[in-house]
Amino acid sequence: MIDTPPRGRFGRAMTALALAGLGIAIYLLAARLLGEPPACGPVKGCETVAASEYATLFGVPVALFGVGFSVVLAFACVAWWRRADRRALYTAYGLGLAGVIAVAYLTYLEIFVIGAICVWCAGYALAIVVGWALTAVAAWRTSA
Amino acid sequence: MNKASNVPQTRRARRAAEREAGHPSRRRTAPRRGRSPLLLITGIVGGIGVVVLAGLVLFQGGSGATDATSELISPRAPTPVALADGRAVGKADAPVTLEVWTDFQCPVCGQLATTVEPALMTKYVTPGVLRIVHHDAAFQGAKSTSSYDESVEAGAGARCAADQGRYWPYQDWTFANQAGENEGAYAATRLTAIATAAGLDVETWQACVATGSAQKAVRAETSQAVAAGVNATPTMSINGQTIVGLRSVADLGALIEAAAASPSGG
């Protein structure tokens, strides 16, 4: 494999963002399983979002999907960063794009349907979007 | 590969080495971007994403009013009816009273009712330490442009259920079947289904609801709550100490135990 120039910086940042997303998803899942609202601090909205019907999909907490997704994404990012595996980069790119679509939909639900913003969910969405943007740049540079 | 020992250290040198190691003929004849799988991945993932999103919008968008008369969800932790006393539950001489101003349409009230209160029932109500009293604060329905106020109607149904000694089963079933706000979750047909599931004499219950006096009572108690400073749901009060919003079982438990231990509370 060719060790393309931006791999180090981009790999680190992508992995860090994927792990940040994983941490948030694990926290939200733990709060859900414990039956307690996520701690929002002075910002309100987490309780409303967590209690809404959209917090589960087919009876499964949405946070569980987030945990699974972030684990796979983090593995792909690490594989590219540490092993220069180009397939892993493309996997991260595809997963990231799916993640961006998913968080865009969930953010739409928060703003326009539930009428409340959960800062944890917003943080997760930000990590996914920025992570995917980095992945897209890295993939473009790698393939160019 | 033995090339590894000669990997150029700077970015420019690596790029130069890559150019050198590449195949100039291929680079000239075909744009390298065209060989990239990015476009293919974007197309496939984007296409699948759009299809899945459309499915979700149809599935979740249809889970409100259109599902109103479909099968109801059973309460996960039904309130022990033996401890019920109208819209209160627990011994009348319990040292601590938790008053709750609630709205059947409020999602956080739903979380309080389905996750926190059942734990409090087990830990404090059953042993006789706590009495929980529910009050109406029917705010959410006012956000609807419809003349049918789902918060008020659900609350009225609860009062008529209380007339039959079954407020708590009704509230358990109602909160277990929240489905959006002002979207038909508490349409008359669905409330009737809930009343049936809660074990009420439905004809008597319907006659009670039809008089409109229960709705007036809900609105009156809501006005009293507003006058007393309640402007959000759920609002709670433990022996006079006001708590706005949801709290964990542990947090409420600490307040309950403190109130029970205090001379005025005990």
Regions found by a protein language model. Give the residues of each.
Chain B
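Basic/polar, acidic-poor N-terminal "presequence/leader" segments
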Residues: 41, 75-80
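Processing junctions and N-termini across compartments
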Residues: 100-103, 230
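Short beta-strands and strand-loop turn motifs
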Residues: 101, 134-135, 206, 234
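C-terminal cap of thioredoxin/glutaredoxin-like
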Residues: 2-67, 96, 192-266
